[in-house]
């Protein structure tokens, strides 16, 4: 038996998805065959998902804006009273244009889009960006969620470089949630982190990310951190909003107006 490596393969969950699997393999530059792979990008009835391989592997990770956690948060998440809404400056008559420069699986961006914000998302890791692209495409077909994801535009690549080379109108608010080595024990976060960490690693460039965001945003920068984590090296935030497990550090530049 071959030892498991660190590679990634693409596989179809059934014969009818073989062509889609070939397309994704070509786009991502990944093989369709690799018996030693540590991860599989799987193509099936539920779209695209990433499955860690091996006996102790958690379940697959995919993006689903229509059902599950996203649907529950959309319906019961607290609307404009949510801390993230206050952090980015949502108020009566104010729905800022927001750039989420560390999009991940798009959960926070989806919450803000569901509250009416026009969102631009940047994701640097090609596999995570592929999950996000697939989730957005499936959500567009849903009658209720389609208009929400219609407010979400996905860009791929290095967020620092993209912000430094930004052309056109600057985003009013830039939202950052750098990958941070924290110990959240919830099953879902644990599963996603176990899959993410080997693929993405920690954002050791967080100070440069903050610097680029502060240079570009017209009104404010918001940084989400684990509640007890230190602030990112660089300018100090003016204030923070603190929740049970996380907090939002606010770096204002000028007031948002209705």
Swiss-Prot record:
S-adenosyl-L-methionine recorded as keyword: yes
Reaction(s) this enzyme catalyzes, per UniProt: guanosine(1516) in 16S rRNA + S-adenosyl-L-methionine = N(2)-methylguanosine(1516) in 16S rRNA + S-adenosyl-L-homocysteine + H(+)
GO molecular function: rRNA (guanine-N2-)-methyltransferase activity
CDD domains, A to Z: AdoMet_MTases (cd02440)
One term under GO cellular component: cytoplasm
Basic and acidic residues composition-biased segments: 239-252
Family listed: Belongs to the methyltransferase superfamily. RsmJ family.
This protein's UniProt keywords: Cytoplasm, Methyltransferase, rRNA processing, S-adenosyl-L-methionine, Transferase
Subcellular location, record wording: Cytoplasm
Residues annotated as binding S-adenosyl-L-methionine: 123-124, 177
Principal cellular location given in the protein's record: cytoplasm
The UniProt record lists the keyword Transmembrane helix: no
Function: Specifically methylates the guanosine in position 1516 of 16S rRNA.
Protein name in the entry: Ribosomal RNA small subunit methyltransferase J
């Amino acid at each position: 038996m071959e030892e498991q490596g660190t590679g990634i393969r693409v596989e179809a969950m059934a014969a009818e998805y073989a062509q889609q699997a070939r397309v994704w393999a070509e786009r991502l530059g990944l093989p369709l065959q690799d018996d030693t792979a540590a991860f599989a990008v799987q193509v099936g009835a539920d779209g695209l998902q990433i499955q860690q391989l091996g006996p102790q592997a958690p379940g697959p990770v995919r993006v689903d804006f229509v059902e599950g956690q996203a649907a529950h948060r959309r319906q019961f998440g607290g609307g404009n009273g949510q801390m993230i809404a206050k952090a980015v400056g949502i108020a009566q008559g104010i729905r800022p244009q927001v750039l989420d420069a560390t999009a991940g699986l798009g959960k926070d961006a989806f919450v803000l889009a569901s509250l009416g914000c026009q969102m631009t998302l940047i994701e640097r890791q090609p596999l995570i960006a592929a999950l996000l692209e697939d989730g957005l495409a499936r959500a567009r077909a849903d009658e209720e969620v389609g208009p929400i994801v219609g407010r979400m535009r996905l860009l791929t690549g290095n967020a620092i470089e993209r912000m430094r080379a930004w052309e056109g109108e600057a985003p009013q608010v830039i939202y950052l949630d750098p990958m941070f080595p924290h110990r959240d024990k919830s099953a879902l976060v644990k599963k996603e982190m176990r899959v993410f960490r080997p693929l993405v690693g920690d954002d050791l460039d967080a100070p440069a990310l903050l610097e680029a965001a502060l240079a570009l945003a017209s009104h404010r920068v918001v940084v989400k951190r684990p509640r007890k984590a230190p602030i990112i090296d660089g300018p100090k935030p003016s204030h923070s909003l603190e929740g049970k497990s996380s907090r939002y550090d606010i770096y204002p530049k000028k007031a948002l107006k209705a």
